[in-house]
Amino acid sequence: AGAVIPGWAAIEELGGVDTVQVDADELFTADSVNLEDIRIFKGGRIDRAILYAASILNQSCETLRGLFRQISEDRTDILSPVKDLETPYGLGFAAWGDNNRVLIGNRAYMEKEGVPVPETEYEEEHSQHGTLQILYLAVSGNLHAMFVLRSTGGRNAARGLEVLQKENIRLLVTCKDPSLTARHITDAYHLPEGMVTLLEQDQCDALNAAPAQPE
């Protein structure tokens, strides 16, 4: 069995390694996520949806913070104060803002919290059958918006991943962005199917508990 090496450090000297572990923040920078579409649901308002999302993501998600800061023209002064931030891994974020409980996350998170979501066919259509990322926003238990996103790979990470691909080394990814899947990472960097695994919470815990590799 090969070792799990965290990060890009000494990537050219990976003798005997079969797996590298990185965080999604190392694959996608704050300016690599694009907003493709916003769908607003009954009772929602586009300006409020963007403000809620920007306020929470500014404190909780590196890869999405840049996008929503850009949409709000970097006006951090207009962001709502956020209280009691929760970050259930792989699902999304919850917080109190403007006296409302706000949830931002994927379909699984909305369903877990009892928020009604559109039919899967609607999501499939707007995500172009899973090619694009979907991020839902709910306020006080009601679905307000669906953000449709696309992440673009970066040049530096692409070079590192090319080395891994040549050596048949798999990539384990920890990720706070609930809209990202292994497929999105694979597509963004044109990697072979099966090379990328998005880690679950218990796998992250096991990695953190594992003894560090000797220098």
Language-model features, listed with the residues they occupy:
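Juxtamembrane coupling segments of multi-pass membrane pumps/enzymes
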Residues: A1-I11, R69, R75-I78, I185, ...
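Conserved ATP-binding TGD loop and adjacent catalytic N/P-domain core of P-type ATPases
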Residues: G97-N99, V139-E215
